[in-house]
């Protein structure tokens, strides 16, 4: 790796239209898993001005069976969608949780897909689709995440918390952040540029002589304070450039400003561009879908490898075929930072964790309603707490060391 370089990652807030769609989709996943831990869900969401549309396939005992909805199920789905939007904070003329039109186009899962995936006599549960999945970890932050993405997430998470608490009442739900860091010897040494664009209450802008300079100064001062709280002080220098709402006025936002779709922020969801991505989104999918569960187990394995001191950086790839239980390939890359041969680690991992779809779900406890909270501010680098974010645990460290005799 080069000795000195710049690297950038971005994040988007829970009020970004694509993230609104992700959170709605995962709220539906949680709704069905709470009723049937073996539910099959593939829920896509479209959001736009005063409209939310669901589409996809499901199978859920007691909710949708034999092509029929259970009494009250459709009302519960709509209530879940509206509650999710309300919790995000949308009560605007162009997008209001209690006034948008709602369309539910969910229907039954294809029996031809089900026959390849379901367990049967003498047959293990197969992968729900073919594909490649990547996991990554780095020791550059306590969360074992790329610092550029870690800080981008935390800036927006703090702003959302302050908005909901009334500390920053001039903020509205839609926002984006971007952090550029200079690295030396693979360590972040300086923030060269930070971008924050946030939707705001009327009047809180000043651009090309238009707007209210005092209100914009208040907003800018607040955002700079959040940045100073999130980033380590030694990274912020006299040369750091700040772009706070650089286009000026940002009053129309969220689904009223741009249409949102599930699965369009997969780099924000994962590693901010620091790692390869297999291309499959997570939100709206139950954990039998390896796009989701295999991405979680690869993060878990990579994080435990780095936490065990076996490497400073680790990338893992798994691949699957639809209807086939075992992965087709396992690949480990320690980026020249490892203390153990990568081939040895590749051989050991399947001995420690069964990497079939069912094995992954069992090891991590994924058949639970834990997904809405993953759908904003990143699926990785979060705090494992009870059932939440189990792929962030580091409980495999000792077993890895023992298996590799280190």
From Swiss-Prot:
Q: Which residues bind K(+)?
A: 44
Q: Which UniProt keywords apply?
A: ATP-binding, Cytoplasm, Magnesium, Metal-binding, Nucleotide-binding, One-carbon metabolism, Potassium, Transferase
Q: Which PANTHER family match?
A: S-ADENOSYLMETHIONINE SYNTHETASE
By sequence similarity, the record places it as follows: Belongs to the AdoMet synthase family.
Determine the domain of life of the protein's source: Bacteria
Q: What is this protein called?
A: S-adenosylmethionine synthase
Cellular component GO terms held in the UniProt record:
cytoplasm
Encoding gene, per UniProt annotation: metK
Q: What is its main location?
A: cytoplasm
Source species of the chain: Sphingopyxis alaskensis (strain DSM 13593 / LMG 18877 / RB2256) (Sphingomonas alaskensis)
What does it catalyze?
A: L-methionine + ATP + H2O = S-adenosyl-L-methionine + phosphate + diphosphate
Known EC number: 2.5.1.6
